[in-house]
Amino acid sequence: MKRLTITLFILATLLLNMLPACDGLDDHYSTNPTYRLSFSTDTLAFDTIFSTIGSTTRQFMIYNKNSEPLSIESIMLASGEATGFRMNVDGRKGSSFNNVGILANDSMYVFVEVTVDPNGGNQPLLIQDSVLFTVNGIRQSVLLEAYGQDVNLYKGGVTITKDSILTANRPYLIYDSLVIAKGVSLNIEKGAT
C-alpha cells in the first residue's frame, strides 16, 4: 500500500510539472524575422456611418501560418482613439495591446466599431486609421476606413407645428415618428433623403 501511494505521488508530481507545457506558448515564441502575420483583409471598410450613431461591428482575422508560435509585440490603433475607431482583440477592448501570443497555424479575431463625430459639413467625410501589428520588430497593418455623414436627427416622436421644408443638404434620420400637426404643411425638396 505504501509503495502504491509513493508511485501515485510521483506520477501526480510528474503530471503537474508537465501541465505548463500544454498551453503551447510557454515563452517559446519564434524570433525568426522572416515570419509574418497574415490577415483576412488588407482594408476593413465600413459603409456610411451617421455622425454620433455607432456602426455595426466588423471583423477581420489574424493568421499565424508559420510553424512556430509568435508573440505579437504590439497591436494598436495608429491614431489611438482620435478617429473614433474602437477594437476588441482576443476578447479584450482597447486601443493598444502588448505581447499577444498566437499559436503556430492558429488565428485570432479582431472586432472593430466606429463612431464618427459631427463635422458640420453636408458631404460625407472619409475617416481613416490603421491597426498596426509588430512581430519580431517588423510592422504590418490593416487599413480601417469609414465615411462619416452628418444628419438631421429627429428622435422620439417629433411633431412639426409650423410650415417647414426638409432640405436636400443632408440626410434625415427619423427615430420613432415624425408627425405633421393639422393645418401645417411640410415641403420636401427634390433629392432629400
Stretch-by-stretch model annotation:
Residues 57-64, 112, 127-134:
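Buried hydrophobic-core signal for structured, non-transmembrane domains
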Residues 29, 142-165, 169-170:
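Low-complexity, Pro/Ser/Thr- and charge-rich linker/hinge segments at domain boundaries
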Residues 167-193:
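Extracellular beta-helix/beta-solenoid repeat scaffolds
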Residues 18-21:
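C-terminal motif of bacterial Sec signal peptides marking the signal peptidase cleavage site
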Residues 33, 50-69:
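Short beta-strand elements of extracellular/lumenal beta-sandwich folds
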Residues 43, 48, 74, 107, ...:
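Coil residues (strongly favoring Ser/Thr
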Residues 23-27, 116-150:
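Terminal connector regions
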Residues 23-45, 65-113, 118:
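Surface-exposed binding patches on compact interaction domains or structured appendages
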